Amino acid sequence: IVIMGWDLIYLILSFFKGWGADPNMYFNTNIVVGGNNLNGIFTPVVAVTAAVIFIWAVLWYISHKSVDGISKAVKFLIPVLFIMMGFIVIYALTLPGKMIGLTALFTPDWSALGNVEIWLAAFGQILFSLSMGQAIAVTYASYLPSKSKLIDNVLIVVASNSLFEIFTAVGVFSILGFMSLRTGLPIEQIATSGTGLLFVVFPEIFNIMGDVAYIIAPLFFLCVFFAGLSTIIAYLEPMSMA
């Protein structure tokens, strides 16, 4: 939820590129007080605190309506997420340098198959994205009719999840390829992982995109917000029904 709070702040900032010319400095001084260490862990950030409170209020409003409220929220969030991400991917594929990113995405490094950390990261991604072994699946399954085709449902969920992840990666790496072309830096150096990619690298990319970034950036951070909101709703459901 804290990361969603950061994203909500960046969603607002994206309308006027409020992170400034140095997104890394802005992130470490205004969002993560103390930088990437524990120096500022007990220093509250007013904007982040307000964003987290707002998100909890939205979650309460959705979840207190029980299954009906959650169902309506997800039926709205997921299709809108697909539409917005589709627009971003289509635009990303028009950017110069897109092939740099797509080549990096789809060119396999066979030597990595011998790296245990790669396998652990892959299994971790699968477990998290599919919610395997978690109470979410059990709770949602309890709402299904007794004659539901479990195997068919599993295949649909797995295929849909994997296809959307690949679809999203096409857009993300196309944009990273654009950044690589404009800056002259190798994509491996640009494509950091975690919050650095989301809150530092992408704002830097939006800074050099020009006026179109005032459309793409809000859509991007709104997609992240909707994805996070739908995920948290799923995690709250087992607790609310316990």
Where are each of the predicted segments found?
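Predominant activation on well-ordered alpha-helical scaffold segments within soluble catalytic domains
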Residues: 9, 199, 203, 237-240
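Membrane-embedded translocation segments of transport machinery
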Residues: 71-233
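Helix-loop boundary elements of multi-pass alpha-helical membrane proteins
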Residues: 65, 152-155, 241-242
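Inter-helical loop and helix-membrane interface segments of multi-pass membrane transporters/permeases
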Residues: 3-67, 99-120, 192-199
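Hydrophobic core segments of alpha-helical transmembrane domains in multi-pass membrane transport
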Residues: 1-15, 50-63, 79-92, 172-173, ...
